[in-house]
Amino acid sequence: FITESNSAMASPVVAVLKPQGRGVRVCVNYQYVNKYTLPDQTPLTDISEIIQRVGQANFISLFDAKSGYHQCMIVPEDRWKTAFCCDAEMYEWVRCPFGLRGSGCTFVRAIRKILHKVRDCTESYVDDMAVHTVGPWQKHLSDMRRFLEVIKASGFTLNLSKCTFGQSEMKFVGHVIGSGKRRADPDKVDSIKALRVPETKKQVRQLLGLFGHFRDYIVNYALHAKPLTDLTGKRVPNRVPWGEREQNS
């Protein structure tokens, strides 16, 4: 994934603790590089459209791209920009690293290009890919075979431990979908219940973003969310007041 470098610049390496004490993740801080990188405006597919298409399927199989962004190669003339120092040596990335401003969009475009030939039976959201079939089991096997053939031809690899095959209902992009039905993922709902009370406008906006993910399951969502939406108004101080009205919403 990396090679030795003689670049005229290098970004610093930082260590980040993983959640639940699962160790340390070593990352490169590309803050300076990102500052001078033009933004990539590649949009993500609308989740509601994905749910609508995949949710009608009789059979669904999910696939996870192994190592995510690392599957995308960096053109040789740009690799020097990714240089970093570690253990008194300098290295640069051969494959796309995490942390670069354009890594996510580059990966999304690559996945879409790969799946273009099987777009009639596949959907993707970042590194999650679904093969969905409306019809009998044999047709789903045929759809999976077509999917795996284009993945193999692309050179991309899959994380087998995170793949699930031939289910009539499964979790995908925060929802449980299949056989024409859908509902909120219970694990996602539980994680929202465990969130701390927001203290600033920014935290309220983040909370509303999470709640909005499930607005289709809440009758009169806008009415219920209004006390929180009001906290984002210009006349409300940055340190937001939180009372019974907000808690009950």
Label each residue range with its predicted role.
Residues 1-249:
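Retroelement reverse transcriptase polymerase core
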